[in-house]
Amino acid sequence: SYYELLRDHISNFTEESLQYLSQEAGFSLLESRVINRDTIEFVLQKEAKENLSIFRYSGQKIDISPLLENEKEIQEDIEAHIAKLKEKGERIAIWGASHQGLTLLSTTALKEVVSYIIDSAPFKQGLYSPASHVLIVPPEHFQEEPVDEILIVAPGYTDEIAGIIKRDFQPCPRILALRGERITEL
């Protein structure tokens, strides 16, 4: 998804470009895998220059048009969802002051309607999100300022967070998650 291409990170890599960079820095690749659908994990070992293999990428340049299409689809889905919220006079919060959530807030119309960001990490609470300037609050804040729905934007923790909301939030708001390029109700 486009929201994984982080504007606040200095570099984003493909497996091939990261392998090339690692070898240029004097490391050999022992193991490579993709975790959480989009994070490249490498196990590297420092090598003497003469022991390094030469990496040559023979593939094609990367076509980013699917990434751009994904961004467009997410933008359109979010705008349609916001229109329905406004029509009903309802309020939304998001759960997750993560890179995905902060990217979505800073690049979509969500920043105009989100009441607050819930995050259970104490070091984030009381701060404001970059670019969108939305307050980050602890989960207990919901009891002081209930919203009609919560959009979970912490993909690795969606089920866990949904369970917390169902267990602890009364009245229970609608629980949503961004799956692919669509907002879905859980």
Q: What is each stretch, according to the model?
A:
Residues 27-37:
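Conserved S-adenosyl-L-methionine
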Residues 38-42:
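Short hydrophobic/aromatic beta-strand or adjacent loop that forms the aromatic wall/cage
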Residues 4-5, 20-23, 44, 183-186:
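Extracellular glycan-modifying ectodomains
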Residues 11, 33, 71:
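Aromatic-acidic/polar surface patches that form glycan- and anion
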Residues 12, 29-31, 43, 93-94:
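Structured core elements
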Residues 1-11, 15-17:
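Short, glycine-/aromatic-enriched active-site segment of Class I SAM-dependent methyltransferases
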Residues 43-186:
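Hydrophobic, well-ordered beta-alpha structural blocks that scaffold small-molecule cofactor pockets
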Residues 12-29:
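Conserved short secondary-structure elements within globular domains
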